Amino acid sequence: GGNITVQIGDEGILLVDTQYAPLSDKILAAIRAISPKPIYYIVDTHHHGDHTGGNANLRAAGTTVSGGNMAGAIRDSGIGAAIIAHENVLLRLSSDKTPQALPSGGWPTSTFFGSKKELFFNGEGIEIIHLPAAHTDGDSIVFFRRSDVISAGDVFVTTSYPFIDTASGGSYQGYVAALEKLDDIIIPVYGQDGGTLVIPGHGRISNLGDVLNYRE
């Protein structure tokens, strides 16, 4: 499955992606070994099952948000963590024409249409940035501003050459533009020796040099 990013702070826990459903118990156990805080948010970087398969399980293990620390209203999502994603992720996960569609319990409960959604959680500004027609038509990267960390989803991986899912709206031009957007955000000297840390969809934690090499 894909990498999962976990943000833990005084307010609670935010996850980026959820891997496959059969791994949910192990994932939750690993999180609980670090913190007993409630899971309030899950962010889907795109709709593929190795990143969203655990949505329903980890949502059910979470806690419903109360209060207004997110820009944009949350749909009536029942009990559990809020699942945030671009609208195209919801459209694909809820479509009977999508091979990797999920039951409704795994669908995003809060979606956005534009280029970005902003969240303030655990004392940190978080930007969820849509990258149109890249790996798919629903890709987002998640930028943790204070931590100087980007969770990149499958627009950047270290384990293979780029895969463009054209059947799901991906394109070569969009993929290149997504990598250029990553380059624009990454700061090579701030915070740590390698600058902004980039968590790929698959593979090891990386930095600007790795992203530039991948783009070439």
What do the predicted segments below correspond to?
Residues 13-20, 162-168, 205, 210-212:
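Second-shell loop/turn segments in exported
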Residues 73-131, 136-137, 145-146, 178-186, ...:
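Metallo-beta-lactamase
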Residues 9-14, 21-81:
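Active-site metal-binding motif and surrounding structural segment of the metallo-beta-lactamase
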Residues 1-30, 140-144, 149-154:
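Conserved beta-strand hairpin/beta-sheet module of binuclear metal-dependent hydrolase folds
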Residues 18-19, 47, 88, 154-155, ...:
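Active-site metal-binding loops of divalent metal-dependent hydrolases
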Residues 149, 173-216:
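Divalent-metal (often Zn2+) His-rich catalytic cores of metallo-beta-lactamase-fold enzymes
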Residues 43-50, 131-142, 199-203:
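Histidine-centered catalytic micro-motifs
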